[in-house]
Regions:
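Hydrophobic membrane-insertion alpha-helices, especially the h-region
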Residues: 11-21
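N-terminal Sec-pathway targeting helices
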Residues: 2-12
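Aromatic-lined carbohydrate-binding/catalytic grooves of carbohydrate-active enzymes
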Residues: 410-495, 499-557, 581-584
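Active-site-proximal substrate-binding groove within the catalytic cores of carbohydrate-active enzymes
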Residues: 112-124, 141, 295, 305-313, ...
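Sec-dependent signal peptide cleavage junction
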Residues: 22-38
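Carbohydrate-recognition beta-sandwich/jelly-roll modules
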Residues: 101-459
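Beta-strand-rich N-terminal accessory domains
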Residues: 34-43, 68-151, 750, 767-777, ...
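Hydrophobic transmembrane helix bundles of membrane-integrated enzymes that assemble
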Residues: 460-463, 506, 566-579, 680
Length: 789
């Protein structure tokens, strides 16, 4: 039930835009309606600047570092006074002979070039080196020319616009190409600080590089950024860190958290296709302009790269809500594969100039997005553990140590089974909407009894469409609709479920309001974009518009409803299609909220819900919700099928298994039934079904829950059969971390767990055998002690 959202213009006019100091970008044109990120296109990287002619650049060869005079006995550089601004650097890779020691830990050593602030990190035991610039050994093979050759060598790139020119287009400039000067360079206790001065465009961007025990961090200090007459749009800091080109006999890939995760594999034949990956962390912000796309939102601010035995995993630690992930395959911009955060400071939006028409112009806001620090941490992996499973393991450790996630404690030896029960929905009638009953509270008890009678244990119920008016009636959720049994009927059902030790969560959406209840007035309480337009969602079933609720207004409503959930006896709330899943700024002056403030508001709702009721479930949750949720429902288990992305991987599932339970799509709505069942087994996901007591086809035409095959009686036998297989595969490893994942052969996948158990899934229509194991066609086996070498 994930939804796209659209914008509808309001009374905002051009005069308002001009008075607010907004920037005209180009003449009005057709306006895409759906909130998401732009598709791959070279122009999205920013038009090259003509600030300088391209310089041919030959990189200096690698050299041994000088003796560590600047290091203390403990191996860490002492803070040094700030140096004067450096002369403009040459258009070339930094000379490694001039690098100096900056910091050292037990595992790593940091070196820096005080002319460019480029750095390299050495793994002391293995001798492997990660550079913030292209590998000098591979650079002579680079054939790209012009501005992008300079961009690849630069420690920082910026995209900007000239606000004083109404015809200005966004341009990209590198610090090297813009006659860059390095100001205020100084060594610190953990690394170094410096300010990149773009002398042509007049940007000054202060940064820091600091080393941890097994990682290195890059930092941008937003509040110290200086702009001249031009307006900063985004920044890529050390974009080529860890970059690599294809090598024969060497496995290499980029990991992007698209959906469940995906690989961009290194390939020998570069096509010069300018396609690349670019996606907003936590999805698009509906308060700004977004192109239509089917790409999965980016839920986890993490990425990685492997080149042979050398690998890193990058984490956007702070400021990620204003970040995008940018990944370029080899051939897009030179021979190198690279992946980096793209930090957003301004973004485009549509300034409407009419009430009812979609006329207006695209523009950028005057104010920058600002957070205290924008931090990227690069964990450097050891040579023997450098695949994507090792990256996920390192990220999981980070979530436990720094984000408050805790290892899971299963309540039963049986795996969880999630039953979504649909109370009611509405569909279009002759004169007014028609109410469709799916499951009364009495019938809900019958569903539970049927599941228990068929041997399905460890059951959790999520009851949706219980509110007055059914699932598609948004706003004023309480009381429970009398046609389903009212509050008393719901209490009786929950009491019965509790007698069987079954928790009941009530499904709720506070993101939309279609009925004006709760004192909601769209004009006063609706979420607004930067032009002042009230934002609305278009229901694809009936094309009717529903107002998006201001996040702070929604938080107040959710908090006020907690006492009523508690009175019913609910064990928690399942937030779907909103809280914990979508993140938007709000320019409603009554409830103004930046993206950062909206994030904290959502975290507050989740925390209050858990404290009041004991449990919180979220649909396909973003990272910032994970430390509060008990369960992630309908977690993405595939990817967006970009043409340059090669294959999906269960990166998110490897991270989460053993920390929080998760399901994939409802089992009775699978498109490829057997393959998707096997994928759930491979990914360690638990079973979930959506049920009604009404017969199949009864919900046809409903605005939201229109699915045909939901009659629980049609699924009891199949659900019980699958539940046994889920228990066979996952019952013993509910609290175990996934430690490995690989292909044994085409369409034969192995998932390894702590303690030695492995699950081998064969998607082929023929049996698989390798002399150690035999896996039947379209089936799986469990190997308790793991595969022998």
């Amino acid at each position: 039930m994930s939804r796209n959202r659209v914008w509808v213009t309001s009374a905002a006019v051009t005069a308002v835009a001009l008075a607010a100091g907004l920037y005209l970008l180009r003449a009005p044109g057709d306006r895409p309606l759906y909130a998401a990120d732009p598709p791959t296109a070279a122009a999205a990287a920013g038009a090259p600047s003509a600030a300088q002619a391209a310089g041919a650049a030959a990189g200096a060869g690698a050299a041994q570092p000088p003796p560590p005079e600047a290091a203390t006995a403990a191996g860490t550089a002492q803070p040094q006074p700030a140096a004067a601004a450096s002369a403009a650097p040459r258009l070339a890779l930094p000379d490694e002979a001039g690098f100096r020691p900056a910091a050292e830990s037990a595992a790593l050593k940091l070196w820096v070039d005080d002319k460019t602030a480029h750095f390299k990190v050495e793994h002391k035991q293995s001798g492997q080196t990660w550079r913030s610039y292209p590998d000098p050994e591979q650079w002579p093979k680079e054939t790209i020319t012009g501005n992008w050759r300079n961009n690849l060598m630069s420690p920082i790139m910026a995209e900007y616009i000239d606000a004083s020119n109404s015809k200005s287009q966004a341009k990209t400039i590198s610090w090297l190409e813009d006659r860059g000067a390095l100001e205020s360079f100084q060594l610190t206790a953990g690394g170094f600080r410096a300010t990149f001065h773009f002398t042509g465009t007049q940007f000054k961007i202060p940064v820091e590089v600091r080393m941890k025990e097994d990682s290195v961090e890059t930092v941008i200090y937003d509040r110290e950024i200086k702009e001249g007459k031009l307006s900063l749009l985004n920044v890529k800091l050390y974009p080529l860190f860890g970059s690599a080109a294809y090598k024969e006999q060497e496995e290499g890939y980029v990991v992007v958290p698209d959906g469940s995760g995906a690989l961009i594999r290194f390939k020998p034949n570069l096509t010069n296709d300018k396609s690349f990956y670019r996606a907003s962390v936590y999805g698009a912000d509906s308060a700004f302009f977004n192109e239509k796309t089917a790409r999965n939102p980016l839920r986890l601010p993490v990425f990685g790269m492997k080149a042979g035995s050398r690998a890193f995993v990058g984490v956007m630690v702070s400021g990620e809500e204003y970040g995008k992930l940018f990944a370029a395959p080899g051939g897009a911009f030179g021979q190198y594969y690279w992946v980096t955060p793209e930090w957003q400071y301004r973004t485009k939006y549509f300034q409407a100039t009419g009430k009812k028409t979609q006329t207006g112009f695209f523009t950028y806001s005057k104010d920058r997005f600002t957070v205290p620090e924008r931090v990227t941490r690069y964990y450097l992996l050891e040579p023997g553990r450098s695949d994507y499973a090792a990256m996920a393991d390192k990220y999981r450790t980070y979530l436990i140590k720094e984000k408050g996630l805790k290892p899971l404690r299963p309540k039963s030896g049986d795996v969880p089974f999630y039953a979504d029960i649909i109370g009611a929905d509405i569909k279009k009638g002759l004169l007014w909407d028609k109410y469709i009953t799916g499951t009364t509270t009495t019938e809900a008890a019958d569903i539970v009894k049927g599941l228990l009678a068929h041997g399905i244990g460890n059951l959790t119920v999520q009851y949706a469409g219980w509110q007055d008016g059914g699932y598609s009636s948004y706003g004023g959720l309480f009381p429970v609709d009398s046609r389903l049994g009212g509050n008393e009927g719901m209490k009786r059902f929950i009491d019965y479920a509790h007698s069987e030790r079954i928790p009941v969560y009530l499904t709720a959406n506070y993101t939309l309001n279609s009925n004006g209840r709760d004192g909601f007035w769209p004009m006063f309480d609706g979420m607004r974009d930067l032009s002042g337009t009230v934002l609305e969602f278009e229901n694809p079933a009936n094309r009717e518009m529903t107002t998006l609720v201001s996040p702070k207004f929604a938080a107040r409503l959710a908090d006020g409803d907690l006492k009523m959930y508690k009175e019913l006896g609910a064990d928690g709330v399942y937030y779907n299609e909103g809280i914990g899943q979508y993140l938007n700024s709000d320019f409603n002056s009554r409830y103004s909220a930046s993206r950062s403030e909206a994030l904290q508001s959502q975290r507050g709702i989740l925390k209050q819900t858990k404290e009041a009721l004991g449990g919180v479930n979220v649909e396909n949750a973003n990272l910032y919700a994970l430390d509060q949720v008990d369960h992630i429902h309908r977690l993405a288990d595939t990817y967006s099928y970009d043409i340059f992305v090669d294959e999906p991987i269960p990166f998110a599932q490897i991270v989460l298994h053993g920390l929080v339970t998760y399901t994939s799509e409802w089992s009775n709505l699978r498109e490829q039934y057997r393959n998707e069942f096997l994928r759930s087994i491979e990914y360690g996901a638990y079973p979930a079904y959506v049920f009604t007591s009404a017969s199949s086809g009864s919900m046809k035409g409903a605005y939201s829950i229109w699915y045909y095959s939901m009659d629980y009686r049609d699924w009891l036998e199949k659900a019980a059969e699958e539940y046994k297989r889920f228990n066979e595969a996952l019952g013993a490893v509910q609290d175990k971390f996934i430690t490995g994942h690989r292909a044994l052969a085409p369409n034969v996948m192995e998932t390894a767990y702590e303690g030695g158990q492995t699950v081998i899934v064969n998607y082929n229509e023929q049996d698989y055998s390798d002399g150690r194991v035999r896996v039947p066609a379209q089936d799986f086996i469990v190997v308790k002690g793991g595969l022998k070498p």
